[in-house]
Amino acid sequence: MASVKDRRVESPATDTDLGRGVFEFSDRYSVFDWGEMPDHVPGKGASLCTMGAYTFEQLAAAGVPTHYQGVRTPDGETVRLADAPEAPTQMVIDLTQVPTLPFEDGSYDYDRYHDAGGSNYLVPLEVVFRNAVPVGSSLRTRCAPADVGIDADEWPQGPVELPETIVEFSTKYEEQDRYLSRSMADEIAGDADIAELDALARRVNETITDCAADAGFVHDDGKLECVYVDGEVRVADVAGTFDENRFRFDGREVSKEAVRQFYKRSDPEWVGAVKDAKRAADERGVADWKSLCEPSPDPLPPEILQAAADLYAAGANRYTAREWFDAPPLGDALDAFE
């Protein structure tokens, strides 16, 4: 489960105090939980850092607690996004404890995770909020339309709006994402309260949805991570980016989902092998599903790689209402994926 960003510790967290760290955003990307893909998308790291910082500052204005402290400039200062001289690639954050999640005898040991984390830890869940069901949503494989209030026997081919926002919980540190019942999520969350995580996710969703609307986007869904500190849950990791959220512009996908869908069309052998390997790993009770997947992904064609770079850059310009990047109109970048 390789990340697209690196975490640098400047002062470590302890049982009683938060630390200080820096996210260094790279141009790496990952689809289908593969980890680092063959290509790097030029400028992607700066795009994600810029959008994430913008979102965190909007959340702060709305009174939502987060771990964000600012962005790091080339000369080492920590400033608000508006004061950054160029699109940043480093984000300064409060650090909490992130214990190792043990895997033994075919299962994960969350009791040991929480014993190590105490009352200051990263909640080992992803909190997912859904306003709509786009083409690539896992909800389409896990639920019938009627289960989520949609009056249809089968899922429509295009995105479909939900009658009300849905909040779900999935595992964070397992080799495969696993959606959970509320009771199981509550158990895995430790001292963090599921109702508070749900409420926090809805506040984050509202803020990102408003930011998206101001930029001419439709916000379909997203995910967030949270820290639990001194009895309070706060937004962690990064939020409101094209990797954590799915948006639409003029009815077309504006997120990492565009690359996922390209791979489904252009490299179905690898996509199918990933699915089969995950299923086999579940059946065998092993964590490392990639060792069961023989094919590797093909590199992106040069024109698609450039289109992905343009998507991230042009989309970040639009979302933040500032021309950070020299990029073509967003619609032109999206044309290449069709």
Curated annotation (Swiss-Prot):
GO biological process, one term: 'de novo' IMP biosynthetic process
Pathway connected to this protein: Purine metabolism; IMP biosynthesis via de novo pathway; 5-amino-1-(5-phospho-D-ribosyl)imidazole-4-carboxamide from 5-amino-1-(5-phospho-D-ribosyl)imidazole-4-carboxylate: step 1/2
UniProt enzyme class: ligase
Catalytic activity: 5-amino-1-(5-phospho-D-ribosyl)imidazole-4-carboxylate + L-aspartate + ATP = (2S)-2-[5-amino-1-(5-phospho-beta-D-ribosyl)imidazole-4-carboxamido]succinate + ADP + phosphate + 2 H(+)
Disulfide bonds: none
Alphabetical keyword list: ATP-binding, Ligase, Nucleotide-binding, Purine biosynthesis
Homology family: Belongs to the SAICAR synthetase family. Highly divergent.
Name of the protein: Putative phosphoribosylaminoimidazole-succinocarboxamide synthase
